[in-house]
Amino acid sequence: MSDSPFEAPNRVDFHFDVICPWAYQTSLWMREVAERRGLEVDWRFFSLEEVNRVEGKKHPWEREWSYGWSMMRIGALLKRHDPALNDAWYLRSGTALHVEGRQPHRAEVARDLLSEMGLDPGLVDEALADPTTHDDVRADHERVISMGGWGVPTLVFPGADEDVSRKIFGPVLIHPPTGDAADRLWDLVVGW
């Protein structure tokens, strides 16, 4: 841990969309910081499909299957069982997409990934059959929008209420730092 002239938060909400490669890279750094600093990370959703939707086209929640949205619905269902499962799902599906070149946005690949995690592949169908998973993803997305956010990664440092919460877009990372370099970047981000 580095010496810091300010008190760093002990919790952060990390809003992500599985399809974003930069949010994925930043999430690797965030996990490093969480482990080194004892930081609590709440992995929350944000839809790049929705924010980039062309007028007249369907919203992601109006489609039977939607590229990033459906993967987040799976995460929403997992998060209800255990928030750590949403983190594990994001890491696994993000690694599959951005490192391994797999297509977790395809239902059959999502099922395979859940199996690889030791989870029931039927959770894909359960998440898609449950309309309230739309609500969970949409609520997280709209939270960021209401705070003036527009993309991922977005970090929110929760305050007593949304009015005093602090939001930061980024950092956008290509090569996430580790060790002391990860700590130094964290100090810069929270000191912003």
Model-derived segments and spans:
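C-terminal cap of thioredoxin/glutaredoxin-like
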Residues: 28-34, 107-192
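A short linear-motif detector with a strong N-terminal bias
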Residues: 20-23, 133-135
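Residue-level signal for beta-strand positions within conserved beta-sheet cores that form or flank
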Residues: 8, 37-39, 164
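Structural alpha/beta surface segment adjacent to cysteine/selenocysteine redox centers
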Residues: 13, 18, 24-110, 188, ...
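Short, flexible segments with low predicted structural confidence
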Residues: 5, 85, 115-116
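A short beta-strand-turn-helix
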Residues: 1-10
